[in-house]
């Protein structure tokens, strides 16, 4: 397994170009199964989960190519089963189910894998498809969906806010007969992006970005060209990297309006921030950040995917900050690793109390999930001495060339190839 070797401390400064958002690219790639004509998807990040998805779409019979953009022609799809060998590494595979049953009347997906963060069941996806008229069976580790004729529009009230299930219901409803209303829908920018992509192919979706999405079913979707929005979590991660090192950064190809909660907290921490249409700059003027209190919440609240990075910020800040995680259980796995580097923190159920220290020390640490592992790499950049981050395949699932981008900001980081 590959590792990162990071030598610190360094002050990170310079420019970084933000990649397309994985969490928008994945649902968009799966939603392309609904289209009868070729689509071109631009600004797709080069990541393991994206490669797996392209492989999966190919196995279903789609023609998939990558040359700059990703090109998908789902016209020839003639296989309706997403097999275990591809699904096991990636939870997002469940997103194949809605489009398959909506367009072809049948679909089956092996129960998914992915990051080990708490309970993330697929039951909300299943109940949503059932309300649209699909018959669902769970057999031999597969979720099997079928419908005679077309799915039927329905008024669906989500039990709890779920990005994944909102995508499933919204994509399936585009080809359903009649109108579907999703109440208590997720409002994330990646949902908006997926809806905008579907509309570009001829879908009729309104209300994306609010908690009430209305989808008027259409007979078919055609082709089109679409550009994936910038990755707000990657943007936030690099902004934190500069903030904790007293540095200065310019993020290009960013989308500031997707990061309001994060930018507000960085300003509270003492960062000088400016934004333009597609850029964000942050300058700490060499200062140490001030501790901030953070409570994660569904969008437009503070994103859970930025929690680990802000935990680290608090652990090296002036003062004491409290982090409350309301979205996922089991999401403080980075803290014991940071304590090995000299951090001071106590965890009480879903709350972490972080006491800032002036300096962390390099240590051997282990990545446990995608965002936690990013915080360990950033910790290595500012710690005294050498940090080895093990199991970095987690990082490769969500960050495109993170070591190259950090090196360009002055970090001393190398990938060490594993056996």
UniProtKB/Swiss-Prot annotation:
Keywords assigned: Cell cycle, Cell division, Cell shape, Cell wall biogenesis/degradation, Cytoplasm, Peptidoglycan synthesis, Pyruvate, Transferase
Source taxon at top rank: Bacteria
Residues bound to UDP-N-acetyl-alpha-D-glucosamine: 91, 120-124, 160-163, 305, 327
Residue numbers carrying 2-(S-cysteinyl)pyruvic acid O-phosphothioketal: 115
Cystine connections: none
Uppermost EC category: transferase
Known catalytic reactions: phosphoenolpyruvate + UDP-N-acetyl-alpha-D-glucosamine = UDP-N-acetyl-3-O-(1-carboxyvinyl)-alpha-D-glucosamine + phosphate
Involved pathway(s): Cell wall biogenesis; peptidoglycan biosynthesis
Single GO molecular function: UDP-N-acetylglucosamine 1-carboxyvinyltransferase activity
A Pfam family the protein falls into: EPSP_synthase
EC number: 2.5.1.7
Subcellular location as annotated: Cytoplasm
A Gene Ontology cellular-component term: cytoplasm
Active site per database record: 115 (proton donor)
BP GO annotations: cell division; cell wall organization; peptidoglycan biosynthetic process; regulation of cell shape; UDP-N-acetylgalactosamine biosynthetic process
PANTHER family on file: UDP-N-ACETYLGLUCOSAMINE 1-CARBOXYVINYLTRANSFERASE
Function, in words: Cell wall formation. Adds enolpyruvyl to UDP-N-acetylglucosamine.
Alphabetical list of HAMAP family matching this protein: MurA
Similarity annotation: Belongs to the EPSP synthase family. MurA subfamily.
Name of the protein in question: UDP-N-acetylglucosamine 1-carboxyvinyltransferase
Organism (species): Klebsiella pneumoniae (strain 342)
């Amino acid at each position: 397994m590959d590792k990162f070797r990071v030598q610190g401390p360094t002050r990170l400064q310079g420019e970084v170009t933000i990649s397309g958002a994985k969490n928008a690219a994945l649902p968009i790639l799966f939603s392309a199964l609904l289209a009868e004509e070729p689509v071109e998807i631009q600004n797709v990040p080069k990541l393991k989960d994206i490669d797996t998805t392209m492989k999966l779409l190919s196995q279903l019979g789609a023609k998939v190519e990558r040359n700059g953009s990703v090109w998908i022609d789902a016209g020839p799809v003639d296989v309706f089963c997403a097999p275990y060998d591809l699904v096991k590494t990636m939870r997002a595979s469940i997103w194949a189910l809605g489009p398959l049953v909506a367009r072809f009347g049948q679909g089956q997906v092996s129960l998914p894998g992915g990051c080990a963060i708490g309970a993330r069941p697929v039951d909300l996806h299943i109940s949503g498809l059932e309300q649209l008229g699909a018959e669902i069976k769970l057999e031999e580790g597969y979720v099997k969906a079928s419908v005679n004729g077309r799915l039927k529009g329905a008024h669906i009230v989500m039990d709890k806010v779920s990005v994944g299930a909102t995508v499933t219901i919204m994509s399936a409803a585009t080809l359903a007969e009649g109108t579907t209303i999703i109440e208590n829908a997720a409002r994330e920018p990646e949902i908006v992006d997926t809806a905008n992509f579907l509309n570009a192919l001829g879908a009729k979706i309104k209300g994306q970005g609010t908690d009430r999405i209305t989808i008027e079913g259409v007979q078919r979707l055609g082709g089109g060209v679409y550009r994936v929005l910038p990755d707000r979590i990657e943007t936030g991660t690099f902004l934190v990297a500069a903030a904790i090192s007293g540095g200065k950064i310019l993020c290009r190809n960013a989308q500031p309006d997707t990061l309001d909660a994060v930018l507000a907290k960085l300003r509270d921490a003492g960062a000088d921030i400016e934004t333009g249409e597609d850029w964000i700059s942050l300058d700490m003027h060499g200062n140490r950040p001030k501790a901030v209190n953070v409570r994660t919440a569904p969008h437009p609240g503070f994103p859970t995917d930025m929690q680990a990075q802000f935990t680290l910020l608090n652990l090296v800040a002036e003062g004491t900050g409290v982090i409350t995680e309301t979205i996922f259980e089991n999401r403080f796995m980075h803290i014991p690793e940071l304590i090995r580097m000299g951090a001071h923190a106590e965890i009480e159920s879903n709350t972490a109390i972080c006491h800032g220290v002036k300096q962390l020390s390099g240590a051997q640490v282990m990545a446990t999930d995608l965002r936690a592992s990013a915080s360990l790499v950033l910790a290595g950049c500012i710690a005294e001495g050498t940090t080895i981050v093990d199991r970095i395949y987690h990082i490769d699932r969500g960050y495109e060339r993170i070591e190259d981008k950090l090196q360009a900001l002055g970090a001393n980081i190398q990938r060490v190839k594993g056996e």
